[in-house]
């Protein structure tokens, strides 16, 4: 029997609850499709940081490295300075495990209403592929004369051909299994050096994919076109900063951050990829059972796809979508069940759901990611 070893980082706030709910769906998929899941819990997050003063140590990195994938719930705690856990733990793992490609689906599922008029499941199914380790997020820079009227801040942005090529190549391979339309999003009329490097890489990689159409949209224009005409896009490839911003915009279009999943992908398979819902730790509702585990379940579906378990991924995605369509509210006390109960409903639905009811499985993101899974 195929066995996948998952490292589980529940994290902070609602993170442990939504992760536990998502794992119920993963285990149901394993039972249905004949593979096994073994999990190891890791105590990383605010409590561990407050005890040790370290967000991520080398021993934890090496222990995590021995797993096939990492499931992360959420991090963030009012007792910890904002950014410490996000940079120290999440960005730290992305860099340590060469998770150079971030995958953010923007899909409106049947029964979920978008806040944007005219958006429907028929015209909202795109993927944002974001370079995950470079750009302005490398952290380089300095500030001179802080706290004075003469303060000057310099923030460095680094863009390299190898990292950009790896991201663009991944995007072309993915879009080849979908509708074969790739869009580069940048701001090359202003960020002329980095923007031109991105365009050069896209043009070069495109020569190897003659059946894929590709175009370009400025980042500011994308903020107009994506919400008003999401059906125009199939796969959007972009840099770290623009990808971070656009994927949150996309989450709004698809019904909110509470439904948004993500994958931090190591495309070469040299270290585990990491899967996490986009939402935060929501410490104000932690322990109340008001958090919707759908984004965590959908992230777990991405994890199964990344492990090559296409059928399990499709079933978990379809089960989460099916349960979402039945909820009287997408979060809070009016959701129609607490976090664990919604998780159980998703897991129960996995056992007999038909993925074709939410779209063509052959053109789905789950199928595309499973085909790209390192062997």
Ranges and model annotations:
Residues 46-49, 107, 225-328:
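Glycine-rich phosphate/nucleotide-binding loop
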Residues 12-15, 68, 129, 171, ...:
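Buried hydrophobic positions in well-ordered alpha/beta secondary-structure cores of metabolic enzymes
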Residues 291-375:
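Mobile late-domain/C-terminal helix-loop "cap" segments
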Residues 61-83, 205, 211-269, 350-354:
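Glycine-rich phosphate-binding loop
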Residues 32-58, 224-226:
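N-terminal beta-loop-helix "entrance" segment that forms/cooperates
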Residues 7-24, 28-30, 148-220, 232:
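Glycine-rich phosphate/diphosphate-binding loop of Rossmann-like nucleotide-binding domains
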Residues 2-6:
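Extreme N-terminal starter segment of soluble prokaryotic enzymes
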């Amino acid at each position: 029997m195929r066995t996948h070893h998952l490292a589980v980082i529940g994290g902070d706030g609602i993170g442990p609850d939504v992760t536990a709910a998502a794992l119920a769906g993963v285990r149901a998929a394993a039972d249905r499709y004949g593979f096994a899941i073994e999990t190891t819990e890791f105590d990383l997050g605010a409590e561990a940081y407050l005890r040790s003063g370290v967000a991520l140590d080398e021993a934890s990195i090496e222990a995590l490295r021995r797993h096939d994938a990492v499931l992360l719930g959420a991090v963030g705690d009012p007792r910890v300075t904002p950014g410490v856990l996000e940079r120290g733990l999440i960005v730290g793992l992305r860099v340590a495990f060469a998770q150079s490609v971030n995958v953010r689906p923007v899909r409106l599922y049947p029964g979920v209403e978008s806040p944007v008029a005219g958006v429907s499941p028929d015209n909202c199914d795109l993927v944002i592929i974001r370079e995950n380790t470079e750009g302005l997020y490398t952290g380089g820079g300095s500030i001179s004369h802080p706290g004075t009227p003469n303060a000057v801040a310099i923030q460095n942005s680094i863009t390299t051909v190898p990292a950009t090529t790896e991201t663009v190549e991944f995007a072309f391979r993915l879009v080849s299994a979908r509708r074969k339309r790739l869009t580069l999003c940048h701001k090359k009329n202003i960020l002329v050096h980095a923007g031109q490097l991105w365009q050069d890489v896209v043009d070069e990689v495109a020569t190897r994919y003659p059946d894929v159409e590709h175009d370009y949209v400025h980042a500011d224009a994308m903020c107009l076109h994506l919400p008003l005409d999401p059906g125009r896009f199939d796969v959007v490839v972009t840099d770290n900063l623009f990808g971070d911003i656009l994927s949150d915009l996309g989450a709004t279009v698809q019904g909110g951050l509470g439904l948004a999943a993500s994958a931090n992908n190591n495309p070469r398979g040299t270290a585990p990829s990491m899967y996490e819902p986009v939402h935060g730790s929501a410490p104000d509702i932690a322990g109340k059972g008001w958090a919707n585990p759908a984004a965590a379940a959908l992230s777990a579906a991405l994890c199964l796809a990344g492990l090559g378990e296409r059928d399990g991924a499709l079933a978990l995605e379809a089960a989460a979508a099916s349960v979402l369509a039945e909820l009287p509210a997408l979060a809070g006390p009016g959701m129609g069940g607490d976090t664990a109960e919604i998780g159980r409903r998703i897991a129960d639905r996995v056992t007999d759901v038909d993925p074709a009811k939410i779209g063509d499985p052959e053109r789905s993101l789950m199928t595309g990611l499973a085909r790209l899974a390192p062997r």
